[in-house]
Amino acid sequence: MERLGQPAYRSRQLWQGLYRDRIASLDQFTTLPIPLREELKSSGWAIAFPFVQKRFTSTDGTVRYLLQFSDGQSVETVWMPEGDGGEQGDGSEDGPSYDRATICVSSQVGCAVDCQFCMTALLGLLRNLSAGEIVGQILAVLKDENVDVEKSRINLVFMGQGEPFLNFDNFVKAVTLLAEAVGIPESRMTVSTSGIVPRIVDFGQLAIRPKLAISLNASNDESRRELMPITKKWTLEKLMSAAREFPLRNRERMTFEYVLLGGVNDSEQNAREVVQLLRGLRAKVNLIAWNPGPEIPFSTPDPQHVEAFQQILIDAGIPTFIRKPRGRDIFAACGQLKRTELVTLS
């Protein structure tokens, strides 16, 4: 606006319209004079909300959005009303009110990390999302759900498609916009990483910093290398060293997520090894029983194994929660995002 010779309040009007009122086109910007709107258009300025290509609704109220960008690429964003099954990293259930919800956000189209238990890995990495595209997902979902962030408690989890720390700069810009412009504080955001050690260090230095969750999923290097090939580059020793040096805030705990695969990483011995890994850390653990998907050769663990695993960690003094699956019937649960149009499990 300054380059166009406009007063400062025009920038505030634009900011308010984009991020708070979620205006989807310049023609709808009635707070701006028509000549200014035309000047913005002629200079190439445009608003491009992601297009809601498909919407799938689960029996539990979860909605999986397939959102398309201007280049034709699409990602999934998940809306979880009335609680998130522990997605915020504390295992708690939100109150029975539509005024509380969680949005699971993608940071890339596809993913390069190649976790063997995750359907997104089958896509490979197609491209990074810009900061605007990351924020645009959230604005599109809030607009579609007709939610006012000033009247509702909205949590964000960067746990959709992609590894946020492999698109770090755009992720950080998006977080800043979400906190300062959209009005969702970083205390209501959680980002999950597969263990990009240098970026964990960088993340700890940010002034505006969401909560951190580390996707662990194995209790030793041998198992983790097979399940998460990124371990070949950053071993558990390096990952846990970064976790121990991470500057936690007062009363903050680092979350470790652990996807339990039947007969693979769900034994009592695995649980005891996790206890040793986390010893001395101010940590909590979210256990996730694997959510099935086609072309993925694993099985969901026996519920008794999940509970036994949890009890060993609790007995060791580690707060441990079993995350309830949300949207499993529409392929919206953890590890199921692959831009599929399937809505029921075979």
Swiss-Prot record:
[4Fe-4S] cluster binds at C111, C115, C118. It is an enzyme of class 2 (transferase). S-adenosyl-L-methionine binds at G162, E163, S192, S215, L216, N217, N291. Keywords: 4Fe-4S, Cytoplasm, Disulfide bond, Iron, Iron-sulfur, Metal-binding, Methyltransferase, rRNA processing, S-adenosyl-L-methionine, Transferase, tRNA processing. Its cofactor is [4Fe-4S] cluster. Its main location: cytoplasm. Its EC number is 2.1.1.192. PROSITE patterns: RADICAL_SAM. One of its GO terms (molecular function) is rRNA (adenine(2503)-C2-)-methyltransferase activity. GO terms for biological process: rRNA base methylation; tRNA methylation. It catalyses: adenosine(2503) in 23S rRNA + 2 reduced [2Fe-2S]-[ferredoxin] + 2 S-adenosyl-L-methionine = 2-methyladenosine(2503) in 23S rRNA + 5'-deoxyadenosine + L-methionine + 2 oxidized [2Fe-2S]-[ferredoxin] + S-adenosyl-L-homocysteine; adenosine(37) in tRNA + 2 reduced [2Fe-2S]-[ferredoxin] + 2 S-adenosyl-L-methionine = 2-methyladenosine(37) in tRNA + 5'-deoxyadenosine + L-methionine + 2 oxidized [2Fe-2S]-[ferredoxin] + S-adenosyl-L-homocysteine. Binds 1 [4Fe-4S] cluster. The cluster is coordinated with 3 cysteines and an exchangeable S-adenosyl-L-methionine. Gene3D superfamilies: 1.10.150.530, Aldolase class I. Residues 97-329 form the Radical SAM core domain. It holds the Pfam family Radical_SAM. The active site is at E76, C334. Disulfide bonds join C104-C334. CDD domains: Radical_SAM (cd01335). GO terms for cellular component: cytoplasm. It is found in: Cytoplasm. Belongs to the radical SAM superfamily. RlmN family. Specifically methylates position 2 of adenine 2503 in 23S rRNA and position 2 of adenine 37 in tRNAs. Reaction proceeds by a ping-pong mechanism involving intermediate methylation of a conserved cysteine residue. This is Probable dual-specificity RNA methyltransferase RlmN. It comes from Koribacter versatilis (strain Ellin345).
